Regions:
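Nucleotide-activated sugar donor-binding and catalytic core shared by glycosyltransferases
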Residues: 1-274
Length: 274
């Protein structure tokens, strides 16, 4: 990507190169590691397993600094007027729908979520809209359903939620750090999935499961990502007290719970150039 091109350019002019937040070469395009090895002085990673990957497998100078999400979420204040502000039903618990950040995946996932909504009349479902996607796009899929759409307030929406249906990505980690039980749901075209399976060598798609190296949150992928299966798993999730999931979330927080990732990184860079 763009950052790697900048790194290569800077190396030509003998600049010290420090890279904060590694490209996910451990997931795909591992060949990019060669550029990192040739051009970087130090790499600062935000996921605990990345240090071992880069250090032991590829002999890079690596520092694990914690995840910057933590610093942001610890500063978050609960909006006590959230329900009234968005005209939500104070008598019904909320289930958040996070169908992705790209139109193509939303078109694939959201109709499945809508089929699930109809099975849970005693709950209210709210879409956490991607910032770059207009409400009209969601409404074209939701149509006359009672699902509400909220922009630019995902964290407060999650805080007020009983559970969430989440498409894979950073959203799974955000949901876990806010201690909300979740199901991870993902579906793409057969061709895209076939190609991805050949390129991506991971046991899980959720960052929560990747970091803890076990299935803490249920992953419903491809043929398992259907209304029937999601309904079954969501019913079970809502019936449980979720103590086991919350306990695992605590472990997750301990693993990445450094709330000074950016400060630590800046200090390490400054110390290296003194």
């Amino acid at each position: 990507g763009f950052n790697l091109r900048i790194v290569k350019w800077a190396k030509k002019f003998s600049f010290n190169n420090h890279y904060y937040i590694s490209p996910q070469v451990w997931a795909w395009k591992e060949s990019r590691v060669k550029i990192l090895k040739e051009c970087l002085n130090n790499l600062y990673v935000i996921l605990p397993f990345e240090k071992k990957y880069f250090n032991e497998k590829h002999s890079l100078n690596v520092e694990y600094v914690g995840h910057p999400l933590v610093e942001h979420l610890l500063k978050l204040k609960k909006d006590t007027h959230f329900i009234e502000k968005y005209n939500l039903d104070g008598e019904k618990e909320i289930i958040t729908l996070m169908p992705g950040s790209r139109k193509q995946e939303i078109k694939k996932i959201l109709p499945i979520f809508i089929d699930v909504v109809n099975k849970f009349k005693s709950y209210q479902f709210v879409i956490a809209a991607a910032p770059s996607i207009e409400s009209e796009f969601y409404l074209s899929i939701v149509k006359n359903n009672s699902i509400k759409i909220i922009h630019n307030n995902t964290y407060n929406l999650l805080i007020h939620s009983k559970a969430a249906l989440v498409t894979s990505g950073t959203a799974t980690l955000e949901t876990a750090l806010l201690k909300i039980p979740q199901l991870v749901c993902y579906k793409t075209s057969f061709v895209s999935f076939f190609i991805a399976k050949r390129l991506v060598k991971l046991n899980y798609i959720s960052l929560v499961n990747l970091i803890l190296n076990k299935e803490v949150v249920k992953e419903l992928i491809q043929k398992n990502c259907n209304a029937k299966k999601i309904t079954e798993e969501l019913k079970e999730l809502l019936m449980r007290k979720n103590k086991s999931i919350l306990k695992e979330y605590e472990l997750l927080f301990k693993k990445i719970g450094n709330n000074k990732a950016s400060k630590i990184t800046s200090k390490l860079i400054i110390n290296s150039i003194k």
